[in-house]
From Swiss-Prot:
Membrane topology according to the record: Peripheral membrane protein
Main location: membrane
EC numbers: 7.1.1.-
CC cofactor note: Binds 1 [4Fe-4S] cluster.
Organism: Synechococcus sp. (strain WH7803)
GO biological process, one term: photosynthesis, light reaction
Function: NDH-1 shuttles electrons from an unknown electron donor, via FMN and iron-sulfur (Fe-S) centers, to quinones in the respiratory and/or the photosynthetic chain. The immediate electron acceptor for the enzyme in this species is believed to be plastoquinone. Couples the redox reaction to proton translocation, and thus conserves the redox energy in a proton gradient. Cyanobacterial NDH-1 also plays a role in inorganic carbon-concentration.
HAMAP family xrefs: NDH1_NuoB
Molecular-function GO term, any one: iron ion binding
Subunit: NDH-1 can be composed of about 15 different subunits; different subcomplexes with different compositions have been identified which probably have different functions.
Gene that encodes it: ndhK
Cofactor entry: [4Fe-4S] cluster
Protein name: NAD(P)H-quinone oxidoreductase subunit K
InterPro entries found in the cross-reference section: NADH_UbQ_OxRdtase-like_20kDa, NADH_UQ_OxRdtase_20Kd_su
The entry's keywords: 4Fe-4S, Iron, Iron-sulfur, Membrane, Metal-binding, NAD, NADP, Plastoquinone, Quinone, Thylakoid, Translocase, Transport
């Protein structure tokens, strides 16, 4: 073929002498023979990256209620949780899968969001149980239950049930692996930028902590206890009464 280097032409002649003429060689079209396809794996960077991630998902278990008891059954030999390559981690910085099982309260919501933010990208979230997805039985009249964890963090897979069986957890993991296998690095990066949260987050207001360590030290409590104790109660320590000591 005109324009080819001598080395390329020599390789082409050697290939035709051993296996016969190559189809498509006249127009320069690339070809893959049967022998080559049986010995060489052709893939893309996205497929290789997704295969490595779906084969070694490391979950962070965030259990707050009875759903976590069903998840604990997977750690035994009856269900063999390790066959999917899932290794539970105790640190969010080493995990790429967050499994939320149980009711999420307004007081625990900042801690949950902090754990999610500490996980490295790419990361996934599974909402396990009715209480996690919608608030469950506490969604009717509770003033502290969050009506769905997706109001705080993005959720990749919902697992309904009260509680879900261990077989349902396996089904959720398999579906998540299929989702990871079809992802692209560029698409995942764009998803993080444009759709950070699935729904509107709660409008939380920071308040002073209820437990201050000064139990029964309020002025009204001290005045009520003095007659019954018959002893002088210690004076109430305030910020104005405590004076810093001068250095000697």
């Amino acid at each position: 073929m005109a324009g080819e280097s001598p080395s390329i032409q020599a390789l082409r002649d050697l290939r035709e002498a051993s296996c016969g003429p190559v189809a498509g060689a006249a127009d320069g079209a690339p070809t893959v023979t049967q022998d080559l396809s049986e010995n060489v794996i052709l893939t893309s960077l996205d497929d290789l990256h997704n295969w490595a991630r779906l084969s070694s998902l490391w979950p962070l278990l965030y259990g707050t209620a009875c759903c976590f008891i069903e998840f604990a059954a997977l750690l035994g030999s009856r269900f063999d949780f390790d066959r999917f390559g899932l290794v539970p981690r105790s640190s969010p910085r080493q995990a790429d899968l967050l499994i939320v099982a149980g009711t999420v309260t307004m007081k625990m919501a900042p801690a949950l969001v902090r754990l999610y933010e500490q996980m490295p990208e790419p990361k996934y979230v599974i909402a396990m149980g009715a209480c996690t997805i919608t608030g469950g039985m506490f969604s009717a009249d509770s003033t502290t239950a969050v009506r769905g964890v997706d109001k705080l963090i993005p959720v990749d897979l919902y697992m309904p049930g009260c509680p879900p069986r261990p077989e349902a957890i396996f089904d959720a993991v398999i579906k998540l692996r299929k989702k990871v296998a079809n992802e692209s690095v560029a698409d995942r990066r764009q998803l993080q930028q444009t759709h950070r949260y699935c729904t509107v987050a709660h409008a939380m207001t920071a308040v002073e902590p209820i437990v201050t360590g000064a139990y029964l030290r309020a002025e009204t409590q001290v005045a009520a206890l003095q007659p019954g104790a018959g002893l002088p109660m210690p004076a109430l320590e305030t910020a104005d009464a405590v004076q810093p000591s001068e250095p000697s």
